[in-house]
A protein has these predicted regions:
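N-terminal extracellular/periplasmic Venus flytrap/periplasmic-binding protein-like
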Residues: 14-16, 27-28, 33-36, 44, ...
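Short, well-ordered amphipathic alpha-helical segments that serve as non-catalytic structural scaffolds
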Residues: 30-46, 69-73, 98-101, 161-168, ...
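Flexible glycine-/small-residue-enriched beta->alpha junction loops
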Residues: 113-167
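Conserved catalytic cysteine-centered active-site region
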Residues: 59-114, 155-161
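Short acidic, glycine/serine/threonine-rich loops at helix termini
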Residues: 21-23, 67-68, 124-130
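Active-site-proximal alpha-helical scaffold in enzymes
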Residues: 90-120, 163, 169-198
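Condensing-enzyme catalytic core mediating Claisen C-C bond formation in acyl metabolism
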Residues: 2-30, 40, 170
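N-terminal beta-alpha supersecondary unit
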Residues: 21-47, 51-64
Length: 219
């Protein structure tokens, strides 16, 4: 097989709107969000679902989402049940690692067509009560926030991941003022791009059914 035949290419790409914590997308768990993303990108790409050979999806905070999140997303998207699926947890790099693994498999000749991406719902991260399975014999027992414990807390440094970011900024001599200015400019560019409709082609609108009707989240 030639190098050209082993080249991995992206034939379709799409994303859901960017949500906020406890915002408009919060009624949907990560696999439900993933299902909508997969269904949308498959439709836009023109790839026949039966031609897809694997689904690889990144997902960090998996507590409470149910067994096999990537497979839930694939089935929820209407893909054939025969297609295997794998969930990847590489913290913030989970979704991109899923894409990398798919590309590696294609270059190796193991796959021809794959769906890859990431899905997350920080709003749906549960609170955990540890130690109750064996029973609490004496004293208090606190709840553990899975969002922090599984997603934002360094297992090795025993600190918030934001602390590592501050340390990295300090080592690179990036001031707080520089960070704030960069963040401000980034937000302003995003607002301008949204207003100009620059993101419309890549976003899959999400419909949320509620007591007051259906809400469409599209930015």
């Amino acid at each position: 097989m030639s190098d050209m035949e082993r080249t991995a290419v992206i034939v379709g790409a799409a994303r859901l709107p960017t949500g906020r914590f406890l915002g408009g997308l919060s009624p949907l768990k990560a696999p439900e969000l993933g299902a909508r993303a997969i269904a949308g990108v498959v439709e836009r790409s023109g790839v026949a679902p039966a031609d897809i050979q694997d689904v690889i999806m990144g997902n960090v905070v998996q507590a409470g989402v149910g067994q096999a999140p990537a497979r839930q997303a694939a089935i929820g998207a209407g893909l054939p049940a025969e297609i295997p699926a794998m969930t990847i947890n590489k913290v913030c790099g989970s979704g991109l690692k899923a894409v990398m693994l798919s590309a590696q498999a294609i270059r190796a000749g193991d796959l021809q067509v794959a769906v890859a991406g990431g899905m997350e719902s920080m709003s749906n991260a549960p609170y955990l009560v540890q130690g109750y399975r064996g029973g609490v014999k004496f004293g208090d027992r606190s709840m553990v926030d899975a969002l922090i414990h599984d997603g934002l807390w360094c297992s090795f440094g025993r600190c918030h991941m934001g602390g590592h970011a501050e340390y990295t900024a300090w080592k690179a001599d990036v001031s707080r003022e520089d960070q704030d200015q960069f963040a401000y400019e980034s937000h302003m560019k995003a607002v301008a791009a949204i207003d100009a409709g620059e993101f419309s082609a890549e976003i899959i609108p999400v419909e949320i059914a509620g007591r007051k009707g259906t809400t469409v989240v599209d930015t």
